[in-house]
């Protein structure tokens, strides 16, 4: 993290995902770094910059996508066309997405696949923000109304895929059954139902 925070190119990107959230609320350990940029970028130029930081093992390179391991830590750089809607949090040169931007991204992730860590992250975000507030951010970020609310409701209430996944390493202890029950409760209290 310190190596990246001193790299010149990093100021063009912002950190989001589980690590971006964990740095703000301290709920769980997350050891991978997902950096986003809202426009196309030159992957070969970024790879050259990363190589100057230490041992880098490239795992995948596609248009606007770099996945690899830098000094034993998984890192990703992704072109992500959706705008950031809240002010960044800063750590040196690293911009970190606001909790509500990450919350909207978590809703999007859950609607596509139900990973346990995403549900757990959402559970902790819901301790601070209402689901309706997160839904408004989701609509603003992705520029669409919740035209497919039915799919989103089903996704938020479908835990089966996550059941077999291991719990992430938690800093703030929580039981999986509690996470599910609280999310169900928040969905029932929201404008979705």
Explain the meaning of each model-derived region.
Residues 1-193:
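Compositionally biased terminal segments of proteins
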């Amino acid at each position: 993290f310190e190596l990246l925070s001193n790299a010149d190119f990093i100021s063009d990107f912002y950190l989001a995902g589980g690590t971006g959230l964990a740095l703000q609320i301290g709920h769980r350990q997350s050891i991978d770094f997902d950096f986003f940029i809202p426009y196309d970028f030159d992957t070969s130029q970024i790879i050259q910059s990363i190589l100057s930081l230490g041992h880098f093992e490239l795992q995948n390179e596609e248009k606007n996508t770099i996945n690899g391991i830098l000094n034993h830590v998984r890192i990703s750089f992704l072109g992500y066309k959706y705008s950031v809607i809240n002010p960044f949090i800063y750590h040196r040169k690293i911009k970190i997405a606001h909790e509500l931007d990450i919350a909207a991204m978590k809703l999007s992730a859950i609607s596509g696949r139900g990973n346990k860590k995403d549900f757990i992250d959402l559970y902790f975000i819901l301790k601070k923000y209402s689901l309706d507030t997160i839904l408004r951010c989701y609509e603003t970020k992705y520029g669409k109304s919740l035209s497919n609310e039915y799919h989103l409701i089903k996704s938020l209430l479908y835990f089966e895929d996550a059941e077999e996944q291991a719990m992430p390493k938690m800093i703030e202890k929580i039981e999986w059954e509690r996470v599910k029950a609280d999310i169900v409760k928040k969905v029932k209290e929201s404008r979705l139902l």
